[in-house]
Design a protein with these regions (language model features):
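Class I S-adenosyl-L-methionine
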Residues: 1-166
Length: 167
């Protein structure tokens, strides 16, 4: 009989982690998902056995604030914001809302992102698949320098140190 390998503690969304997150945290099910799966930028990893998830923000100043502070002119010209389903108004509105949520209530946004990543890790372990995350699908943010919350200097990327993140 096989024994189940326990999930590593920093993958769990337990009371200790909840206490360290924003007090105004709300359940992820109350909002649209932050992470996107299966788009033109992420499906390429599937042939290598990876399920890749990422975040689509409204790039540049589409949300009212610049989410691509380090983007080059070439990046702006080649931006895939309106590629595929991005052409639809409802998708653009969702990306703008997601970007505004990130800018106005970062602690709550990052708490929701933490929960989504934790859930994906548990599902991937159960399904025995590999995960990768690309948090800058249509943005140019330094997630490795953004603290998970106001009580921690650790970023979301450093919290999940055994998971593949790429830009």
């Amino acid at each position: 009989m096989k024994t189940k390998k326990p999930i590593k503690p920093y993958y769990r969304f337990n009371n200790e982690v909840l206490k360290s997150l924003d007090e105004n945290w709300t359940r992820a099910s109350d909002h649209a998902k932050i992470l996107t799966v299966d788009n033109q930028k992420t499906i390429k990893g599937a042939k290598y056995g990876y399920k890749t998830l990422g975040i689509h923000f409204a790039p540049f100043t589409l949300s009212g604030q610049n989410i691509c502070p380090w983007a080059s002119k070439g990046c702006a010209a080649a931006c895939l914001n309106t590629a595929g389903r991005g052409i639809f108004e409802s998708i653009q509105k969702a990306r703008i809302k997601k970007t505004q949520d990130f800018q106005t209530n970062r602690n709550k946004f990052l708490a929701r992102l933490y929960r989504e990543i934790s859930n994906e890790i548990r599902a991937a372990e159960k399904a025995k698949i590999k995960l990768a995350f690309r948090l800058n699908l249509t943005s140019d943010l330094q997630f490795e320098k953004i603290a998970l919350n106001h009580k921690s200097e650790q970023s979301i990327i450093h919290t999940f140190k055994d998971i593949q993140f790429y830009d």
